[in-house]
Amino acid sequence: MTHDVSKYALGRIAEDKACDYLSVNGYIVLDRNWYCRFGELDIIARKNGVIVAVEVKGGKRNADYPICNITVKKLSKLTFLLKAWLHENKLNEFCIDLRIDAISVTFIPELQIRHFVGIL
């Protein structure tokens, strides 16, 4: 499936699969590919009153390895971006529970989705 797909297209497909997974598991997707001058959040979702920024990592093989690409610097940036999203949407970060998750999506040998809850 993925051998002829560009890296960008693979990322979009991975994000689509992640959104489907979140919806099936009781999350409400609030925003996708939210962008500001400092960066981008892949998915912002809510479940049980918790606002969750979800970093999606896609790859062709092994659902454990794409997650290894999330560095401490990236986690710091995700935290900053989530606060910027809250500000833009006029939500007070001190009155809302926040969390950062990651979802790893791989396609070979078959579709595999792993949800890493609360990576920060």
Swiss-Prot record:
One of its GO terms (molecular function) is nucleic acid binding. It comes from the Bacteria. Transmembrane segments: none annotated. Signal peptide: none annotated. It holds the Pfam family UPF0102. Belongs to the UPF0102 family. NCBIfam families: PRK12497.2-4 (NF009152). HAMAP family: UPF0102. This is UPF0102 protein TWT_455.
